[in-house]
């Protein structure tokens, strides 16, 4: 991978986030911010990763990632899969960081109704909508 595509320091990563703050919220900018958060976590800058996590989580809420995307007809099957995977990735990293740092959770399970990615195989799109949207709580397997 070319060196210019990789952050060399935590400072470089934080500067990358400043550019994202000027852009409108979209899935691509959220993915970019989340990748910065992952980078900071990987180099054990957990406090900085947690602070960026506040921005990532709030942006995910603004984009409605905590809601089941199958209930909206405007999303393609690929959009639904990306939204689910991105949300649950954010959720898992947020849980890890709050546990590691001993800070309160910013994503409450009661506020989530998006299904796990790949947790269910639905016959049709209408069944997908019914099974996710009709469930007011977090879908649990096992």
Describe the function of each predicted region.
Residues 1-111, 125-142:
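Extended, leucine-rich alpha-helical cores of fungal transcription factors
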Residues 110-121:
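Flexible glycine/proline-rich, aromatic-decorated loop/lid segments
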């Amino acid at each position: 991978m070319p060196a210019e595509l990789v952050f060399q320091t935590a400072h470089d990563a934080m500067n990358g986030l400043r550019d994202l703050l000027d852009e409108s919220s979209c899935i691509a900018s959220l993915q970019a911010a989340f990748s910065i958060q992952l980078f900071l976590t990987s180099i054990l800058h957990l406090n900085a990763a947690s602070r960026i996590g506040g921005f990532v989580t709030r942006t995910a809420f603004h984009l409605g990632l905590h809601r089941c995307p199958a209930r909206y007809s405007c999303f393609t099957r690929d959009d639904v899969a990306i939204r689910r995977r991105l949300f649950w990735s954010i959720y898992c990293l947020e849980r890890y960081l709050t546990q590691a740092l001993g800070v309160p959770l910013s994503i409450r399970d009661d506020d989530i109704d998006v299904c796990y990615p790949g947790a269910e195989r639905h016959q049709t799109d209408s069944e997908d909508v019914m099974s996710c949207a009709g469930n007011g709580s977090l879908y649990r397997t096992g």
